[in-house]
Amino acid sequence: MMQPKKTKFRKAHKGRIHGVASSGATLAFGQFGLKAMEPDRVTARQIEAARRALTRHMKRAGRVWIRVFPDLPVSKKPAEVRMGSGKGSPELWVARVKPGRVMFEIDGVSNQIAREALTLAAAKLPIKTRFVERIAE
């Protein structure tokens, strides 16, 4: 599971996801990618599940790049605890994903395998995504 080694603060505000992705909106490493079409928070578990689905379908051929990192702690209070008495302890890590952000990139496989693998990975994510391809130069 992905999470930061060290953070400046233990807990973070919830915040909102405004606008579209300006950085990380184009393919930087691979030939094919999976682009987010709506804003949401993606957990470390969801990223890991998508990564496993990708690598399994590719049968360890090619290369995978994960372009999002869960750096935001989400706190949660225990079950059946009364309201108040402070914020809960950090429970999981999430990545804020804006629309247009390339989340995964792959290379070294055919177009068909890439499309199938990224479709399987997209099923593990809580947002609508789109398959993107590098234009031949």
UniProtKB/Swiss-Prot annotation:
Keyword tRNA-binding: yes
Molecular functions per Gene Ontology: rRNA binding; structural constituent of ribosome; tRNA binding
CDD domains for the chain: Ribosomal_L16_L10e
Superkingdom of the organism of origin: Bacteria
PROSITE patterns named in the record: RIBOSOMAL_L16_1, RIBOSOMAL_L16_2
Signal sequence interval, chain numbering: none
Pfam families named in the record: Ribosomal_L16
An annotated GO cellular component: cytosolic large ribosomal subunit
HAMAP family with a match to the protein in the record: Ribosomal_uL16
Function: Binds 23S rRNA and is also seen to make contacts with the A and possibly P site tRNAs.
NCBIfam families named in the record: rplP_bact
Protein name (database record): Large ribosomal subunit protein uL16
Species this protein is from: Bradyrhizobium sp. (strain ORS 278)
Gene it is expressed from: rplP
